A protein has these predicted regions:
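A structural motif corresponding to the C-terminal end of an alpha-helix
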Residues: 30, 72-80, 121-131
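Hydrophobic/aromatic beta-strand patches that form the interior of the parallel beta-sheet core
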Residues: 36, 81-83, 131-133
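Conserved nucleotide-binding/hydrolysis micro-motifs of P-loop NTPases
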Residues: 40-42, 87-92, 137-140
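A glycine- and Lys/Arg-enriched "phosphate-lid" helix/loop adjacent to the NTP-binding pocket
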Residues: 45-118
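NTP-dependent small-molecule kinase module
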Residues: 93-166
């Protein structure tokens, strides 16, 4: 969601943080395999810092938000596996255009580039179980062979000692 209001940025980020934390707590109580599209980390490590850098969240609000996030994370464990879809800017723009969401039509390329840089920086420092998938190479939503390759990568990362060699 894009907006230009310092007044609402903190409130909105707290809303998302609260919602995602509830999801994390619910997941921790469940023994089933759960796949999330968006993680709690993205709000705290990508979007809130971006709003702060853009001057849309005050330093005081950002510090309070970050402290609350750190406290919440001390109460739950990291996911069994974080999957990061690494993508070029042209591919990201293509995917956004394919979605056709009205509110995304005015997104600026420099905004997308900035978010992508934040994602790349954050993922480099992620210390838990991580699988990076080249989203420019693997079109797993359209190509069954790519879907199979990606599911095999996930399976190997979660359960395999030795990846299969083709």
């Amino acid at each position: 969601m894009l907006f230009r209001s310092e007044r609402w940025s903190f409130n909105l980020q707290i809303y998302f943080l609260n919602k995602r934390f509830k999801d994390v707590v619910d997941i921790s109580k469940n023994n089933e395999v759960i796949i999330q599209d968006r993680t709690i980390y993205e709000d705290a490590r990508i979007f809130a810092p971006n709003l702060h850098a853009m001057g849309l969240m005050s330093s005081r609000d950002f510090e309070n938000y970050s402290d609350l996030f750190d406290l919440m994370m001390s109460l739950v464990k990291a996911p069994d596996l974080l999957i990061y879809l690494k993508s070029s800017i042209p591919n990201l723009i293509s995917q956004i255009q394919k979605r056709g969401r009205e509110y995304e039509k005015s997104i600026r390329i420099d905004y997308i580039t900035g978010l992508n840089e934040r994602y790349e920086s954050w993922i480099e420092g992620y210390k838990e179980n991580l699988l990076v998938i080249d989203a420019d190479r693997y079109k797993f939503g359209n190509k069954p062979e790519d879907f199979e390759a990606v599911t095999e990568m996930i399976d190997n990362k979660l359960f395999g000692l030795f990846p299969k060699v083709k």
